[in-house]
């Protein structure tokens, strides 16, 4: 099963929002675990702020039976401890990597730049691409998969890290790039 974990700020809800000078302060932020195939929520936890997802996600994971699942989380959840928690509970993870992990991000970015210049017979990347139309846009996606992660200096910190995936998305709507 695929369990997607994501945080959302509920804009119309607040914790006594009228008493705050900053309109962003006091908004309700919820972390949810969603089973994609079944369309059901496994659970939700309140987070004081979006930045607190890093501490809220492990607490929620402790309450869930995720054994045998693939758990996906956006870049906020791309943390060594969260990856270890998922693996320790018998699941596998797919975590989005962005610049909140600057050293790992830079290593991955440099690797893909290098790998793309290698001759096809030496390439360590598997490549897939597809196009689709959605919401009035023409979308092109290229997916590159590297199953050799030995080049990552911090690979031992990331429990059972086995692949790095790069997704490049280009969109066009009415002749304009999106």
Describe these PLM feature segments.
Residues 15-19, 52, 88, 100-103, ...:
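Detector for Asparagine
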Residues 98-178:
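An anionic, glycine-rich sequence signature occurring as long contiguous blocks
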Residues 1-73, 78-81:
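Conserved, well-structured functional cores that handle cations and Mg-NTP chemistry
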Residues 81-82, 103:
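Phosphate- and divalent-cation-binding pockets in alpha/beta enzyme and binding domains
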Residues 21-22, 89, 110-114:
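Short, hinge-like loop/turn segments at secondary-structure boundaries
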Residues 92-97:
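Short hydrophobic alpha-helical runs that function as membrane-insertion/retention elements
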Residues 83-91:
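Short, surface-exposed basic-aromatic patches at helix termini and helix-loop junctions that form
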């Amino acid at each position: 099963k695929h369990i997607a974990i994501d945080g959302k700020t509920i804009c119309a809800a607040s914790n006594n929002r009228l008493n705050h000078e900053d309109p962003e302060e006091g908004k309700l932020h919820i972390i949810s675990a969603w089973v994609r195939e079944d369309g059901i929520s496994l659970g939700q936890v309140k987070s004081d702020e979006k930045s607190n997802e890093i501490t809220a996600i492990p607490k929620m994971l402790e309450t869930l039976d995720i054994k045998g699942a693939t758990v996906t989380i956006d870049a906020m959840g791309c943390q060594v401890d969260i990856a270890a928690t998922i693996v320790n509970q018998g699941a596998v993870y797919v975590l989005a990597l962005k610049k909140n992990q600057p050293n790992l991000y830079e290593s991955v970015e440099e690797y893909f730049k290098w790998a793309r210049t290698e001759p096809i017979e030496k390439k360590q990347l598997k490549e897939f691409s597809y196009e689709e139309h959605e919401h009035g846009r023409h979308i092109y996606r290229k997916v590159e998969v590297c199953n050799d992660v030995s080049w990552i200096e911090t690979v031992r910190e990331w429990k059972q890290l086995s692949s790095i995936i790069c997704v490049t998305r280009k969109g066009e709507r009415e002749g304009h790039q999106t």
